[in-house]
């Protein structure tokens, strides 16, 4: 991001000047007036030719004189020792190129465009075979020294490094590449030359280079890249731009091509990073837990003298501005003022990365590290994403006081991001949306479509889901439909709002019936999944909490598990152990798919488009078939009604079932390699199948399916009305629609048909048989889940209250009755057993009607 006062063409023309004063702009005024006048003329576009590389155009005397000899007007300039014209960032481009294109500027990428590489200082190059005094002299040509000229502090020879990388680009073919993984790429041709062709077509000036490929091509080049990325990557930029613009001279890009290496084999976990990794290229993996707002970072400061109006520019070195002490034109001290709207800025974002749970040692808390993303990498990741980050590990000193320049001996570390990669081989659709479209080759898509035409594809996919868990086919089918999800519908433009597409499932039953294993399997399968436990979760841990940003010291919102699993699945184990305040936050998320926050002056509404997969155990440690679902797990009916499917996972007391289950469990311990490999292949097909359907198939209801859904809902209501009970609510109809859409996705169908509605009805009916059956009558009563009480229980409660009223009236005008005596009288009068709880409920019902009041052990009439 640059100021409005400077345009790309003006910047590029300034970079293209012939003399090596690019890093000495603050000393331009020391030269004679003729020199300044000539500099002003050059800014109008009349650029003198400069050599394009150390080995090109250096033999001609004009080029040598222009590059290595100072003009007469510059003899008075004091050239600092850390400046050398053979630095990889000082090579220019002949002025014959079109102004305004990337070729009109410096051939290597300017540091202003690569803030991720840090320092803008030019590396001093020294002669390895000369003494210290000779090293200070500017050499006439790198060719005269062969391979001996290196950047100070490294063993990087610019010409050799650039030549090796160009050979790598022009020659490398990946011998391990597979056609399925490289869609649209000829694996027999040089890989990166084909990618340059894609850059020419798409216009995206970024080349992602796999470090593993560089290592297989040249171990020395790979070592230099890992050890000295700040010096080597600009050389790579210069090499790839020369090849690209020689191959595509008419191509116009937004800026010069930037090389972004990834997959550095020096991959470490966060807790293993140590001082030896500082200023080296590393790759770490983790989960993004927070991203900051966009921060403008100054890359080049513009100063103006308040006395004589002389201006100068100063490059920013890792956030430090070298403010001029005096004006070089009028020699007035402390007269230079910073002009913000003439300075150059870049976009910057702070990202907090947390250690992945699978990389965490047992008994340890997760480590976090701060990342800084620049320019095009800003807003590329969101909280909840699992990423592999390649960047340069930095250490900066901590100031004793913000107003004092003294620093402590303790340093704080961060990573300047060069490349993100949102891939996870174990998870579904873990790539970004653009990469998803390129993930499936035509051959793979053809295979998936052939599978979708098989009549038993639904059963095949369900059996491939958690194959180690015995039976529970309907539960696996329900979870499979949850992974596919329905079609997201947005009718907000017509005033009807949004309708959720996510399916919520609750598993409840006896301990040891694989509920937690199913949750762990789903969590490891989806990319934006979160796994929490009931006792280990709080309300703010699920939603969001306010904290003070350590960088800006402002109050910011830190998101919780439900927001981090947006567009994913949130797995909640021990659902019944949650306290009431924690469960209450789920009401809005499970129906409206949003999360409203009003804390510490921060008022917002966050997206939480997540499916909830929960598991709950009964309060008596074993399921009591004589009690309803709500009585067994003690969950509020307002929450249970938001689950589309509620399954019971019971442990039947059956010897034949126990024998089959034991045989299945024992067989898991002596699987052959062929069985394991076959299971892995099934898993790969399952992941690809769901990922393709999730991203490309958006089914709509057909007329036939619409009529079938209407008939199903009306019939469900009719069955209950004949017995004076409610057997369906509009929420059940919406659940049927979502399940039918998910089943259509299983068939790769863009239209929901009657067969999908039938399967949705069957699955919904099976779940209701288990969870909404009245234990007294054995009849399905949906009001158990929606109101917390079956119609039979409600009728018995009313009858008992009426009988108690008649009993009290029959005793005459007695002002007070004993509680225990009244309880024994009503029990003796009734034909059915009456518990103390039922008696107290009847008393409360009469008290609500202002018929009586209970004080202690006495019942008084009103």
Swiss-Prot record:
Similarity annotation: Belongs to the MCM family.
PANTHER family, alphabetized: DNA REPLICATION LICENSING FACTOR MCM FAMILY MEMBER, DNA REPLICATION LICENSING FACTOR MCM4
Chain residue ranges for the region called Disordered: 1-71, 90-121
Binding-site residues for ATP 2, renumbered to this chain: 470, 515-516, 617
Biased composition (Low complexity): 1-10
Keywords: Acetylation, ATP-binding, Cell cycle, Chromosome, DNA replication, DNA-binding, Helicase, Hydrolase, Isopeptide bond, Nucleotide-binding, Nucleus, Phosphoprotein, Ubl conjugation
GO CC terms in record: CMG complex; MCM complex; nucleus
Residues of the MCM domain: 457-666
Biological-process GO terms, alphabetical: DNA replication; DNA replication initiation; premeiotic DNA replication
Name of the protein described by the UniProt record: DNA replication licensing factor MCM4
Modified residues (N-acetylserine): 2
Catalytic activity of the protein: ATP + H2O = ADP + phosphate + H(+)
Motif annotated as Arginine finger, chain positions: 641-644
Additional record remark: Early fractionation of eukaryotic MCM proteins yielded a variety of dimeric, trimeric and tetrameric complexes with unclear biological significance. Specifically a MCM467 subcomplex is shown to have in vitro helicase activity which is inhibited by the MCM2 subunit. The MCM2-7 hexamer is the proposed physiological active complex.
InterPro entries: MCM, MCM_4, MCM_CS, MCM_dom, MCM_lid, MCM_N, MCM_OB, NA-bd_OB-fold
Organism: Mus musculus
Subunit structure: Component of the MCM2-7 complex. The complex forms a toroidal hexameric ring with the proposed subunit order MCM2-MCM6-MCM4-MCM7-MCM3-MCM5. Component of the CMG helicase complex, a hexameric ring of related MCM2-7 subunits stabilized by CDC45 and the tetrameric GINS complex. Interacts with MCMBP.
Sites bearing N6-acetyllysine, chain numbering: 219, 449, 857
Entry binding sites for ATP 1: 496, 642, 731, 734
Xref: PROSITE patterns: MCM_1, MCM_2
Positions of crosslink type Glycyl lysine isopeptide (Lys-Gly) (interchain with G-Cter in SUMO2): 438, 797
Function comment: Acts as a component of the MCM2-7 complex (MCM complex) which is the replicative helicase essential for 'once per cell cycle' DNA replication initiation and elongation in eukaryotic cells. Core component of CDC45-MCM-GINS (CMG) helicase, the molecular machine that unwinds template DNA during replication, and around which the replisome is built.
UniProt keyword Ubl conjugation, yes or no: yes
Bilayer-spanning residue ranges: none
GO MF term (any one): ATP hydrolysis activity
Superkingdom to which the source organism belongs: Eukaryota
Matching Pfam families: MCM, MCM4_WHD, MCM_lid, MCM_N, MCM_OB
